[in-house]
């Protein structure tokens, strides 16, 4: 545990050079609650942070950053499933590797996602046809005001596409652990177009993991080398009537049917169609290999530069398609999270 003025460049994968008044590392629930309450009593803002892989600091932060490093991976099993109880401070990708090594399938499609376990329920992480909501049994969180620990069942988490009850209640709850249920009757999920060709093979979880590892490292920049937060925008979901109108104009537009009858579009394709792939805006840019990823390649771009590039993309896509992209990345200002609607209107 430590507390001191801190530069945040190493604590966000965009490598934005912002500062906070203080940073505290919490390895236990009581430490996390103690320092949150200490700042709250002083009227100071507090931001609970995991790996900083889904945030963009627009300016210096005037309060305390609480690094959630509550550890622990506990595995039990019965005849039908493995049940994992995982501390919020475990790295997500290390958890996936841990299960693969123990021959526990179910997380392989979610390989190589940066960040910590505690952040996974907030945005209902997903990749290659699998979302956290499909395997989450519960989320344990502390009500920061009452100090009580609450267990949210999967249904109570109100998971949606890149959204959950926690996304809108970040100032009230601190996630401390997540419960996962992985079925022993394993069936590969190969619906995603880049995995579809694997159906003809007798595929194993480890092989899917290895394949996704290769894909992601080809498509996405390593944040250690190039500042980025992965996909900056969510894939837009539209009604079928709007989709049909768009398909008449853009017959090659990729789309994905949703269970509720709506249509999900590829935000990356929309951006690329606007000829923005590789576009440079000051010290920020759009990644040449994946239009959905904004980069800070020299690690000298400011948060406002990256946000300005995102706004430029937003306006270009809106003008071309009348579709309004929404950021997946959380925007952090001087006193905390900023409602994206204030920037993307």
Curated annotation (Swiss-Prot):
Pfam families: FAD_binding_4, MurB_C
Gene Ontology molecular-function annotations: FAD binding; UDP-N-acetylmuramate dehydrogenase activity
Main location: cytoplasm
GO BP annotations listed: cell division; cell wall organization; peptidoglycan biosynthetic process; regulation of cell shape
Annotated catalytic residues: 162, 231, 328
Class of the enzyme per the UniProt entry, highest EC level: oxidoreductase
Record keywords: Cell cycle, Cell division, Cell shape, Cell wall biogenesis/degradation, Cytoplasm, FAD, Flavoprotein, NADP, Oxidoreductase, Peptidoglycan synthesis
HAMAP family: MurB (MF_00037)
Function text: Cell wall formation.
Record-stated family: Belongs to the MurB family.
Name assigned to this protein: UDP-N-acetylenolpyruvoylglucosamine reductase
Natural source organism: Blochmanniella pennsylvanica (strain BPEN)
Lineage of the organism: Bacteria, Pseudomonadati, Pseudomonadota, Gammaproteobacteria, Enterobacterales
Gene: murB
């Amino acid at each position: 545990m430590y507390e001191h003025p801190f530069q945040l460049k190493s604590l966000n994968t965009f490598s934005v050079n912002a500062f906070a008044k203080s940073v505290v590392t919490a390895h236990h629930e009581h430490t996390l609650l103690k320092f949150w309450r200490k700042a709250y009593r002083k009227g100071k803002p507090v931001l609970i942070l995991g790996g900083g892989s889904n945030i963009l600091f627009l300016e210096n932060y005037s309060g305390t950053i609480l690094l959630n490093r509550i550890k622990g991976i506990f595995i039990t099993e019965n005849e039908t499933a493995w049940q994992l109880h995982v501390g919020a401070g475990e790295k997500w990708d290390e958890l996936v590797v841990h299960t693969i090594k123990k021959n526990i399938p179910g997380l392989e499609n979610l390989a190589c996602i940066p960040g910590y376990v505690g952040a996974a329920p907030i945005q209902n992480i997903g990749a290659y046809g699998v979302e956290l909501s499909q395997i989450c049994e519960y989320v344990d969180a502390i009500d920061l005001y009452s100090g009580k620990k609450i267990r949210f069942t999967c249904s109570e988490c109100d998971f949606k596409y890149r959204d959950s009850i926690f996304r809108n209640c970040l100032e009230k709850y601190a996630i401390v652990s997540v419960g996962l249920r992985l079925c022993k009757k394993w069936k590969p999920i190969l619906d995603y177009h880049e995995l579809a060709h694997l159906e003809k093979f007798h595929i194993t979880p480890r092989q899917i993991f290895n394949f996704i590892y290769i894909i992601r490292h080809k498509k996405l920049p390593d944040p250690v080398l190039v500042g980025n937060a992965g996909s900056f925008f969510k894939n837009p979901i539209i009604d079928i009537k709007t989709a049909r109108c768009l398909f008449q104009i853009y017959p090659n537009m990729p789309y994905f049917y949703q269970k509720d009858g709506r249509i999900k579009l590829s935000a990356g394709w929309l951006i690329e169609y606007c000829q923005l792939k590789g576009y440079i805006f000051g010290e920020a840019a759009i990644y040449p290999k994946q239009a959905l990823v904004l980069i800070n390649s020299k690690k000298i771009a400011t948060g406002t530069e990256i946000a300005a590039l995102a706004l430029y993309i937003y306006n270009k896509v809106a003008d071309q398609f009348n579709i309004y992209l929404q950021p997946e990345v959380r925007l952090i200002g001087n006193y905390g999270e900023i409602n994206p609607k204030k920037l993307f209107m």
